[in-house]
Every structure is written in C-alpha cells, then in structure tokens.
Amino acid sequence: MDKKGEIDYLSKIVKQDVSVITNINYAHAKNFKNLRQIALAKSEIINNTRVNGSIVLNADDDFFALHKNIAIKRKLKILSFGIVNQNANIKLISIKQISNKFKATIIINNFKTYFFISNNFQNNILNILATLTVLSIFLDISKLNKNIFMGFKTPNGRGDISKIKFNNKNLYLIDESYNSNPLSLKSAILNFDKIKIKKGKKYLLLGDMLELGKHSKRLHQSIGKIINNTKIDKIFVKGSEVLFTYNSISKKKKGRVLNNNSQIIDLIKNDLNNNDYLMVKASNATGINKIINSFKGSK
C-alpha cells in the first residue's frame, strides 16, 4: 500500500472474515503527510471486514486505540497481541535460551503455555504472536506442537544467513536486501547486534530506503543514532539517500561510500576477513539484491 484507497479497493473484493494490522510505520510513505494518515489508510481493511468478523491488532502499536475504536463501531471481534502491552489477549511473558533454541512463554487468553523458536528477534516474536492470535480464532492453541515454529525458514532477502566461501575465506552473509523501510531496518540492525560471534567482525552495507518522499532525509538520519548504539564495526553505504545515514554515524564506524556494484564486490573481496559477518539491507529497487544473490551461490 502506498496511497489512500488501495486497501479499501482490495478488501471490498475479498470481503475477509479475519483481518490483521501488524504495525504502522513509514513504509511506502511518499503519498502521506504523517503516520496518522497511514494508520487511517490501513484502517480501510477494518471497514470492509465481514459483519461478525474478527480484527487482529498489535497492542504495542501507537495506533492501537485508533484501530480498536474503529473496530468497535463496526462491531467486530477484537483480538490483540503484544510484548509490552500486558493487556493484550496474547502476550509474551518471557523468553529464555535453551541450547540452540529459545523458549517463549506466552499467555493466551489467560492460559499460560510456551513454544520453542529459533531466535529472540523482536520482529520474529511479534509475527509469531500475530500468527497465534489468528489461529486462536479457529482452534485450541494449547494443543499445538511446541516446536511448530522451529521449522520456519527465513525467506530469501528477509534476513536469511548464508555461509559463503570467497577468496579462501569463510564469510557469513545476512541478506536483508529484498526491502528496507525505517522499521524493518531498525529491527534488522538490532537483530544483527544481538548475534554473538566468537571470531570476526560485523560489517553493514546499506542501500537507500525508497518511497519515503519528503520524510526521506529525516528518516535516513534517524538510523545513524541506532547504529551508533550497536557493536557493529563498520558501515558501508551505496546510494544517495543513505548518505544522510552515513553522515549521522560516528567516525569510528564509518567504512566508506560505494559508488557502483563493482565496489560492492571489492568490499567483500578485500575488506572482509575470515569469519567476518556482513549484513546487507536495501530497498529492492536499488538492485543491490542481485549482487548479493550472486554471492549466495558461493557456498
């Protein structure tokens, strides 16, 4: 969705029984003045949910109350999920690492249970909570296999990790190059910072976040503060808008500005050493994903 009316048009065709709004952020924001306008555009899905249908909302989102009030007027069944808001129907209570997986303890409509998940990344946890909330409409969640989420494979370009062999070096490539917006980039950076490595360094290659319109400069600059508070070693950028990010990070974290795709190859070839990690994040239209996909064949 990048403009008012798109969700209204599509949801009138579908006439869904269950709708989900995961979050409100500055993705595809070029045609909106502010986040509230985006929230109202997304609320179009509530207006077209069938009578006596259900709406699933993120209780941690800043526009939860707005969407809830619209759903009340539509007389829909409202279900919520969250990590911070403990009034949510389905909420995370705790998460604890056990060997190579994490035990997520969850309250589901006042019933306490748990599931094993592969990582403790917040965006992953929120997606799981949203999924469980939808499932709870149709079945008894307490009877689900505790390892049901362990088989989930991260889609290509959405944070999948590849071990590649290049120039006699073992490198770890975290591919986030399918898309980029302020919220997903923040999540990816914080997830990258959480990864514990015994050897090697962490490098970050960023491309432009596109379709942000007049919000672009401010939102790119805001990423600098997030990066400065991480243990990521060096930042490299390619693009015009992402220069606002590069100019906002501390001097010690600055790698360099890349001007073409061949310099991306040179970065991987010359700057990375054995056991180093490189995370790549950019909007799909930048074309950086094509370069990264070529390296993922070097396993």
Model-predicted regions and their roles:
Residues 1-3, 173-179:
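Switch II (G3) loop of P-loop NTPases
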Residues 154-157, 177-187:
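Glycine-rich phosphate/pyrophosphate-binding beta-alpha loops
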Residues 29-36, 185, 213-217, 289-291:
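Glycine/threonine-rich flexible loop motifs
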Residues 11, 17-172, 194, 198-201, ...:
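Acidic, Mg2+-coordinating active-site environments of NTP-dependent enzymes
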Residues 1, 7-11:
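Conserved nucleotide-sensing/catalytic segment adjacent to the nucleotide-binding pocket
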Residues 268, 272-296:
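A glycine-rich beta-strand to alpha-helix segment
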Residues 177, 201-204, 210-276:
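C-terminal helical cap/extension that packs against the catalytic core
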